[in-house]
Each structure stands twice: as C-alpha cells, then as structure tokens.
UniProtKB/Swiss-Prot annotation:
GO terms for molecular function: DNA-binding transcription factor activity; DNA-binding transcription factor activity, RNA polymerase II-specific; double-stranded methylated DNA binding; hemi-methylated DNA-binding; promoter-specific chromatin binding; RNA polymerase II cis-regulatory region sequence-specific DNA binding; sequence-specific DNA binding; zinc ion binding. A zinc finger (C2H2-type) spans 306-330, 336-358, 364-386. It comes from Xenopus laevis (African clawed frog). This is Early growth response protein 1-A. Induction: By dorsalizing and ventralizing growth factors during mesoderm induction. Responds to the FGF-induced MAPK/Ets-serum response factor (srf-elk1)-signaling pathway. Induced by activin and bmp4 acting indirectly via an FGF-signaling pathway. Induced in response to wound-induced activation of the MAPK pathway. Induced by both t/bra and foxa4/pintallavis alone, with maximal activation requiring both transcription factors. Induction by t/bra is indirect and probably occurs via the FGF-signaling pathway, whereas induction by foxa4/pintallavis may be direct. Expressed in the presumptive mesoderm. In blastula embryos, expressed in the dorsal marginal zone, and at the onset of gastrulation expression is specific to the Spemann organizer. As gastrulation proceeds, expressed in a ring around the yolk plug. This expression is maintained in advanced gastrulae, with weak expression also extending into the dorsal midline. By the neurula stage, expression is excluded from the notochord. In late tailbud stages, expressed in two spots in the anterior forebrain, which are connected via a bridge of cells that also show expression.
Length: 497
C-alpha cells in the first residue's frame, strides 16, 4: 500500500460528498482524468460564481477567474500519474457535466511503503480526495519539493501547477511505466518482465536491459566449421566482431606474427650492442659462413652472433631465423596450424611434412629400390639399409676367393698311390719267365698288361720301378728288351695319341 504525502493549501470551503463526482469502477481505466476534475480556463468562473455562497473566501467571480489564469488546458494535458504517459479515455468525453461546482488544485507525491504487499497503487487516490478537496491559492515558491529519497524530482518540475510522481519498487505492478531515470533500469526493477506491458491499455516497449556478452569461442581458422557451428557464429552480437578470417575467407593467417618478428629483431640488435669488443672482432657474417656448407668443423659458440635472450640459456646461433625458432621452445609458441586437423606446430617444415600425411604425397624416392617417402630423413634412413646390405655381400665374397688355391694342390695327394701298384704287377712278370730263352717271352701279353697299368698312374712312377727290377733280376740281354718295351708303351705316348 502506498502512503501519500500531501502538501496542499485547502480552502475553508469543503465538499460534503467528495465521491459524488467519481464513477465507482473497479478498474483504473474508468477513473476520469485529473484535468477533467479541474476547471478549464473558460468554464472556471461560471462554476465558481454559481456555487460560492456569501461570506466565503472568494470576493467575486472575477477574482476566481484570475486565480486560475495560469491553469490552461495545455498545462493540465501534460500531467500524468506516472510522469510519462496519460490514460486515454474515450468513453468519458461527457463526464464534464458531472463535475462538482468547486474544484481544488495542489501538489502531492506518492512514496512506496516498505512493508506493503498490495500492488494496487491507485487506491490512495480515494483517501487523498476524500479529505483534501477545496480551493487554495498556491504559489510555486511556497510549494515544497518532494522528498530526497524520491528520484523523480526532475519529472515533477516539468509541470509546476499540478504534478504527480510515483515510484514503486514492486516487482510486478499492474500499471507500470517505462522508467526515465538516468541509471540502469535493471537496478530499479531487477526481476521485471515485459508481460505487464502487453496487458496495459497503452503498450510500451520494455526497458532496455544490458545484454550479456556471449562466450562463444570461434576457432582460429573457420574454414572447416560444420553447418551448425556456422549458425552459432551468426548469433554473436554485431559489436563483437569475430576474427578477420571470417570476413575474407580467402585470406590465410600469417605464419609468424609481425610483432613477434620485430620484437626478436630489436632484441637481437640490442644484444649485439652489448657484446664485448673482443667478441666483435671475431664475429663472422652469416652470408660468409654459408659459403662453406660442407665444412667439417662448426663455428665455435662464442663466435656466433645471435645469442638466446633467456638468462638460463647459453645457446648461440649463426642465423637469426635459428634464434627465432629456438625462442619458440621457451615461449611455447606454435604459430603454424594445420588447416585439416587444427594441430599447431612451432616450425613451418614440421607443418609441411605433417600435411603430407593427410594428402598422401611422397616426393622423396629411393635411388636403389624406388620406394617413396614423405620426408627426406626417412629416405636417408632407408638408404643406410641398402649400404649395410652391400657391406654384408662384400664380406661373404672374400672367403670364396681364398678357397680356390686349395683345389690346386689335389694332384699332389694322388702321387703317393702309384708306387705300390707297379710293384705288384712287376713281380709276376719277372717270375713267370725264369728261363733265359729270349724267344719264348710272350711280348704281346706283356704289352697288353703294362699299358693298362701305366694308363691309370703317372709316368714317373712306372718308369722308375720296372726298370730297376728288370736289371736286378736278369743279367741277360732281356733287360734291354724290357726297357725298350717300357719306353715304347709309356703313358706319355698313349696320352698324346
């Protein structure tokens, strides 16, 4: 229930029945407008002159007319219960005939009650009008302002003759107006909903609440977003622009940020200035160092011009790009991203070789077997396998060349066998012919026997043994005959034939 603070000057004339001019209706829309209860500038003297008795506080009708000169119809039309909107009533156009002969004017303000639960704030108008009706001469200087706790003093000062300001903290009033205070509307009505505006006679748009910012994160490269994710991106408010890649899809992000490169360049230049003069004399330009890429020895660390700026790291490099790549190890920066699987890399060559796993490209082929590889180091590692196989084949070929001289000595082993064989055959020959008769010696049989024996063995064994046996067994000329036979039927002549 709202408590009304009334500051009015009431005339001595009181009305016995103040509610006679009000239509008894349960809704707010049936109450007549407050300016219809006042005398207009043209009709004010007629009502005052007809109803004021003698001895009252008014001298004449002229004085009453002058008293309301400043109250015009335009001034009353600006007044409203909520300081912003007026209740439009088309059904009470003829209610002026029911107005009382005496009217009043005044200034009042309504303040909310702390322990009130009733939301029908127009009800205090009954108690206000029932006890305070009359005529009064009000000056703007004598009318006090509203209480300091009310924040609607600026709106009440817009209509000095008669104004009304209402401030309600209830969460769901029946008749609520859009607030015009400078602060945020969410502080006055924290749980306010726009439904009461739809049920009011004159709908007003709901107060502008601060829109909470969405926390939707757009990926770095939105080329591979799914359709539902692209729809979510459109929900982002206009003031929150997504990444620049959304505007121009063809533009790809830079591999290394320019700010990072400049920071490293300035830092390395400052580091060069702080190097001692002894080291400055030994500095070699990177361009001259690149003339000897295959030299066996590297540049000593103290002669490398680009040092790592991290205090705990003593690494130095001959090239600035090597230093930039090394600093990413400390910072953890991975500016190179795969556009297919969104994986990040710290080096561009790592990204290049990684993309080949998606595309299936294998540009490096083996020169020996023709096998293809996606990376050059994989081909190098594969080539070492072929080199090891060649070394194994070379090791197997050396024992075969050593075994060939052994086979050349095989005839010497067979030389030990011919000596006993001719002795076994020579003895029967000498014993079968003990007679000294030369004509009885069977030469054909002897000739047949010896060639068969001598053909299987070497010649030097045959010639040595039979000749000595024959000379020892016979002293007759038969020895010469046997020697001649052995010479004629020697294996040498047989081999030649």
């Amino acid at each position: 229930m709202a408590v009304a603070k009334t500051e009015m000057l009431v005339s001595p004339l009181q009305i016995s029945d103040p509610f006679s001019s009000f239509p008894h209706s349960p809704t707010m829309d049936n109450y007549p407008k407050l300016e219809e209860m006042m005398l207009l500038n043209a009709g004010g003297p007629q009502f005052l002159g007809a109803s004021v008795p003698d001895g009252s506080g008014f001298n004449s009708t002229v004085e009453g007319a002058e008293q309301f000169d400043h109250l015009t119809a335009d001034a009353f039309s600006e007044m409203s219960l909520s300081s912003e909107k007026a209740l439009v009533e088309s059904s009470y156009a003829n209610q002026t005939t029911r107005l009382p002969s005496l009217t009043y004017t005044g200034r009042f303000s309504l303040e909310p009650a702390t322990n009130s639960s009733n939301t029908l704030w127009p009800e205090p108008l009954f108690s206000l009008v029932s006890g305070l009706v009359g005529m009064a001469n009000i000056s703007p200087s004598s009318a006090p302002s509203s209480s300091p706790s009310s924040s609607s003093s600026s709106s009440s000062s817009q209509s000095p003759p008669l104004s009304c300001s209402v401030q309600s903290n209830d969460s769901s009033p029946i008749y609520s107006a859009a607030p015009t205070f400078p602060n945020s509307s969410s502080e006055i009505f924290p749980d306010h909903s726009p439904q009461p505006f739809q049920n009011a006679s004159i709908p007003y748009p709901p107060p502008a609440y601060p829109v909470s910012k969405t926390t939707f994160q757009v990926p770095m490269i939105p080329d591979y977003l799914f359709p539902q994710q692209q729809g979510d991106v459109s929900l982002v408010s206009a003031d929150q622009k997504p990444f620049q890649a959304m505007e121009s899809r063809t533009q790809q992000p830079s591999l290394t940020p320019l700010s990072t490169i400049k920071a490293y360049a300035t830092h390395t230049s400052q580091d060069l200035k702080t190097i001692n003069s002894t080291y400055q004399s030994q500095i070699i330009k990177p361009s001259r160092m690149r003339k000897y890429p295959n030299r066996p020895s590297k540049t000593p660390p103290h002669e490398r011009p680009y040092g790592c700026p991290v205090e705990s790291c003593d690494r130095r490099f001959s090239r600035s790009d090597e230093l930039t790549r090394h600093i990413r190890i400390h910072t953890g920066q991975k500016p190179f991203q795969c556009r297919i699987c969104m994986r990040n890399f710290s080096r561009s060559d790592h990204l290049t070789t990684h993309i080949r796993t998606h595309t299936g490209e294998k540009p490096f082929a083996c020169d020996i077997c023709g096998r293809k590889f996606a990376r050059s180091d994989e081909r190098k590692r594969h080539t070492k396998i072929h080199l090891r196989q060649k070394d194994k084949k070379a090791d197997k070929a050396t024992p075969v060349s050593v075994a060939s001289p052994v086979s050349s000595y095989s005839p010497s082993a067979s030389t030990s066998y011919p000596s006993p064989v001719p002795t076994s055959y020579s003895s029967p020959v000498s014993s079968s012919y003990p007679s000294p008769v030369h004509s009885s010696f069977p030469s054909p049989t002897t000739a047949v026997t010896y060639p068969s024996v001598t053909s299987t063995f070497q010649t030097h064994g045959i010639t040595s043994f039979p000749s000595s046996i024959m000379t020892n067994a016979f002293s007759s000329p038969m020895s010469s005959a046997l020697s001649d036979m052995s010479l004629t039927y020697s294996p040498r002549t047989i081999e030649i034939c």
